[in-house]
């Protein structure tokens, strides 16, 4: 390995000034801080000097002035989402992760969301699209937008997001975006606006708390030439990581909302199937098992 490659590996392995670090106590108490020369973190276990963290390897320990240690780790997206300051209920990481996968959101994606809230989903979107993608986030409550901007600025992700304060009934400024996600109760009222901003074949997604709302959205999706629609919920169960007595934890994150995904189609190309016709077609599709190459 040449000298330059060695320097790159070494740089990635150690804590640098300006990076986010997560300090974890032996009892799994977390602190996420941005490492600054001369900075200090005051905890009930003592003071942690940032200078004692700078240059240390990720995964090592740092000690407070009282001799208590913390592990030094890079925070993942899940930890960052749990640190989001909130005034309202935020989407759970289990739902957010599924949204990213189902809507094809990754490096370079241009995505629009409505219903910024505290910015949990916005954080994940900005994280996923990278420096070459962009997020347009609409919110009609000034106090919520202010909180979201603060949350993303703290994480260094605000430059990937354009925040807009507007009632989405007025429509969106953008066109040809790759994906649109609506976190609003009456998403079914805004599909005309969604069609105008979403590219043909693009991804649409929404989250809703009740089946009645989902039913209204399904009707509106069909009327507005969306197809290949999925409705689902994400159920997550953790297990206690103890080899001798492996079993589920006492608390389970079950139903948190209904997720709806669909694709924008050109007019006159979306399937025209009634409920009974859809069931019949689905049964036929299940019978048509493709032959595997020998």
What are these regions (language model features)?
Residues 106-117:
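Conserved class I S-adenosyl-L-methionine
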Residues 1-74:
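N-terminal auxiliary segments of SAM/dcSAM-dependent transferases
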Residues 129-130, 157, 198-202:
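Helix-to-beta-strand junctions that scaffold the AdoMet/dcAdoMet cofactor pocket
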Residues 2-6, 188-258, 266:
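C-terminal substrate-binding/active-site "lid" region of AdoMet-derived donor-dependent transferases
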Residues 132-136:
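Short beta-strand element of Class I
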Residues 118-131:
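Conserved SAM-binding loop of SAM-dependent methyltransferases across substrates and taxa
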Residues 138-187:
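S-adenosyl-L-methionine
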Residues 10-13, 83-97:
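Conserved SAM-binding loop and adjacent beta-strand
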């Amino acid at each position: 390995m040449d000298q330059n490659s060695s320097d790159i590996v070494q740089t990635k392995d150690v804590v640098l000034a300006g990076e986010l670090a997560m300090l974890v106590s032996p009892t799994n108490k977390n602190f996420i801080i941005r490492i600054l020369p001369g900075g200090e973190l005051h905890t009930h276990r003592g003071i942690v000097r940032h200078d004692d963290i700078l240059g240390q390897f990720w995964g090592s320990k740092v000690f407070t002035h009282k001799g208590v240690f913390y592990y030094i780790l890079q925070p993942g997206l899940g930890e960052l989402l749990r640190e989001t300051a909130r005034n309202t209920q935020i989407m759970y990481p289990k739902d957010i992760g599924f949204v990213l996968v189902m809507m094809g959101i990754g490096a370079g994606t241009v995505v629009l969301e409505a219903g910024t809230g505290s910015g949990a989903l916005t954080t994940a979107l900005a994280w996923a699209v990278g420096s070459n993608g962009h997020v347009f986030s609409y919110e009609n409550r000034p106090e919520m937008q202010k909180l979201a901007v603060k949350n993303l600025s703290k994480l260094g992700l605000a430059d990937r997001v354009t925040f807009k304060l507007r009632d989405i009934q007025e429509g969106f400024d953008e066109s040809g975006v790759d994906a649109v996600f609506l976190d609003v109760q009456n998403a079914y009222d805004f599909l005309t606006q969604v069609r105008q901003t979403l590219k043909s074949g693009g991804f649409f997604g929404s989250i809703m708390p009740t089946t009645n709302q989902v039913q209204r959205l399904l009707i509106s999706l069909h009327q507005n030439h969306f197809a290949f629609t999925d409705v689902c919920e994400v159920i997550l169960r953790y297990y206690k990581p103890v080899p001798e007595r492996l079993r589920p934890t006492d608390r389970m994150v079950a139903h948190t909302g209904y997720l709806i995904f669909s694709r924008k189609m050109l007019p006159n190309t979306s399937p025209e199937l009634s409920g009974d016709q859809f069931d019949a077609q689905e049964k036929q599709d299940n019978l048509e098992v493709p032959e595997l190459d020998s």
